[in-house]
Regions:
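ATP-dependent carboxylate-amine ligase
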Residues: 1-122
Length: 122
């Protein structure tokens, strides 16, 4: 949770310059039995940030989604393969996207694929 807090704080320090900030939040897998508490805590960081919309992927992140302020909610994605088509319709040139989650969620594959096909949006 410390690394995700730092990531959100650093993301918030980047100037929006009239553009939008999107956060794709995947499960943090290595947290043990108190995982739900830590996922809920992340929503507080999101709510206190300048992130415009948050999309979540994974059982734990999806359960915490309801704690994100309504105006900051993107949606729950139940299939990792729906990410690129969904986000490609939303993100405009110059918008900012942060993807964060455990390696086990394979989110790195999304960012690799997204950068290959849509690097103009980052």
């Amino acid at each position: 949770p410390i690394s995700i807090k730092s990531a959100i704080e650093n993301f918030s320090n980047i100037s929006k310059n009239g553009k939008k900030k999107y956060f794709f939040f995947g499960d943090m897998m290595e947290l043990g039995k108190k995982s739900h508490i830590y996922h809920k805590k992340v929503t507080k960081f999101i709510n206190n940030s300048d992130i415009d919309k948050t999309f979540v992927y994974g059982k734990r992140s999806s359960a915490a989604f309801k704690f994100i302020k309504k105006n900051k909610r993107g949606e729950i994605l139940d299939n990792i393969h729906r990410f690129n088509p969904k986000i490609s319709k939303i993100i405009k040139n110059g918008d900012l996207l942060m993807i964060k989650g455990s390696h086990a969620t394979k989110l790195h594959k999304i960012s690799e694929n997204y950068l290959r096909g849509n690097n103009h949006a980052l």
